[in-house]
Amino acid sequence: AHADLRQAYEGFDYSHASIMYNASKIKEVERIAMVGIRDYSEQEANRIAASNGRIVAFADRVIKRRSYAGESWKQMCEDIVKSLSGNVYVSFDIDALDPSLCPHTGTPVPGGLAFEQVFFLIEALISSGKKIIGFDLCEVAPGVKDDWDSIVGVRALYRLANLMAVSQKKLK
């Protein structure tokens, strides 16, 4: 949901709100592509604009508008995949999903991606010949009264692990 491109958050240089800012400072990171962004500051938007294409954002509202205008998710996935290098690290922030799938995440935002929509994108990435070299899942917060967020998170991890193995030709 968030760009996470803040230089610091509440006095912390290394926080959930600054992780992509810190990743952008690593010279070996060729490109950062964010999908489903729907909450970001003017400073973060300026940072994306000033990155000369090194940081690209596929905002949720733009994805939705393209869909409403008749463009398929498959076509949009092709655009997203084209923006990536051959080796891809997937950082899956659970709040990219529709909040009904992760209601206990720290800062839910209306809108978001469907679970299968995310994995259709990752499968398109693999079909293009790109390789997943690693992944993480962040900002999963289990509820006090139910395990819904945990179940969604575990299923995401399971799919990510299997798809990474497929991308590395260790599974079919």
Predicted feature locations:
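Short, conserved catalytic or adaptor-binding loops enriched in Gly and charged residues
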Residues: A23, R47-R54
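Cofactor-binding loop segments of dinucleotide-utilizing enzymes, especially the Rossmann-like FAD-
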Residues: A1, I37, V140
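Catalytic cores of soluble, metal-dependent hydrolases
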Residues: Y40, N52, V56-K172
